[in-house]
Amino acid sequence: MTDSTTGIALLPGIDGTGIFFEPLIHVLPEDIPLSVITYPPNSILSLEEHARFVAEYLPTEDVIVVAESFSGLVGLELLHLRLPAIKGVIFSAAFAEPLHRILIRGLSLIPGIGSMVKELPVPVLDHFLFGNFSNKDLANLLERGLPKIDAKCLKHRAEIIASGYPRLDEHFDIPCLYLKAARDRLVPHTAASWFAAHFNHFACVEFDAPHCLLQTVPAECAAEIMGFYNVLRDRNPSGIKNEE
C-alpha cells in the first residue's frame, strides 16, 4: 500500500520533454501522485534556472525526485536549495562531474549541431540509445519524441553537461538511490562513486541494461523506485545502506 500524500516527481533527460517517461509511468502504481516535469521549450536556462523552474512545479506535499541522466545535475542543484518537501532522490544513470567536455565543446562549434542530432534516423538513435533492448514501442516513442525536442535547448544542455555540477565538494544528508546501467555507453561506470561519497544515506542498484534504464527496463526500475519509496514512507532512512 502506498501513502497518497507522498508524490513522485520525474525530471527528464537532456530532451527535456518528459515523453520518454511513458514506459515507467505505465508500470508505476496508479495511486501515487505523479508529476512529470517538462522543461520549457525555446528557453535557454542555466543549471540554476532549471532547478528553480522545477522547484516552482514541485508538489507542496512530500515528494521523492527521480532525476534522469542530464537532470541528475538539476537534481543536485535542486537539493542545494534545501527544499523541505523533498524527502528523497533517485538518480538514473546520472553524473556530477563534467562529462565528455572536449567532445561536446568541439561539437558545439558546428553550426546547427542540435538540429543535426534531431534529424538522425530513428533506427540509428534507437540502436545507440536502446541497443538490444530496442523494440517497436521504443522506436515509436522516439518518432513521437524527437519532434518535441528544442534543438537550441538540446545544445545548451549539452554544454551544461560538459561543465558538470559546480559544487563537487558538497555533501547531502537526504536519502539517495542510484540506478546504474551496466551497459552505459554515455556515462562512465565510475559516476556512481561520486554520489556514494557525497550522500550520507546511499544505495546503488545495477541493471544489465543501457543508459536509458527507465525506458529499457521500466518494470525493474519501478520495483526499485517503489522499494525506496516505501522505506521513506515508513520514515526509516537508516534502512538505506551504503552499498557502493
Report each predicted region and the residues it spans.
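Acidic catalytic loop of the alpha/beta-hydrolase fold
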Residues: 183-187, 212
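Short alpha-helix in the alpha/beta-hydrolase fold that links the catalytic acid
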Residues: 23, 174, 188-197
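Gly/Ala-rich beta-loop-alpha elbow adjacent to hydrolase catalytic centers
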Residues: 67-75
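Conserved alpha/beta-hydrolase catalytic His-Asp/Glu region
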Residues: 119-170
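Flexible "cap/lid" loop of the alpha/beta hydrolase fold
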Residues: 47, 80, 85-117
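Short beta-strand/loop motif that positions the catalytic acidic residue
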Residues: 172, 178-180, 184
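Conserved HGGG/HGGXW glycine-rich cap/lid loop of the alpha/beta-hydrolase fold
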Residues: 2-44
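Catalytic histidine-centered segment of alpha/beta-hydrolase-like enzymes
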Residues: 45-46, 209-222
